């Protein structure tokens, strides 16, 4: 993937997406907005918003047995500058196997893949399915 190809994808996707799936609110947020373009992180993170009725509401990410890309690594009430007050669990696409920095595009050393907004949305839907399956 070239820098031009990635820039076209980033422009098309935008930096934020909100959707609902099976009654759960989901959020996708791009990291690094407003940073120096040369060093800016541009990977996506995905979050499912939990309510008090959910089994893992208020729990640390490392105690939650659900799987998402790279593992769950976020659980908190607040998310950056987002105003919503929900317990969020989530994951990021900034791992060694992911393209997350501009220099990775031209290094020739990386077999990393850019994880798209569609990919993150699919991962979030699978995460919601795990939450629902764990209710019974």
Regions found by a protein language model. Name each.
Residues 12-22, 57-136:
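Polybasic, proline/glycine-rich intrinsically disordered low-complexity segments
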Residues 1-10:
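Charged, compositionally biased non-catalytic regions
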Residues 10-66:
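Amphipathic, interaction-prone secondary-structure segments
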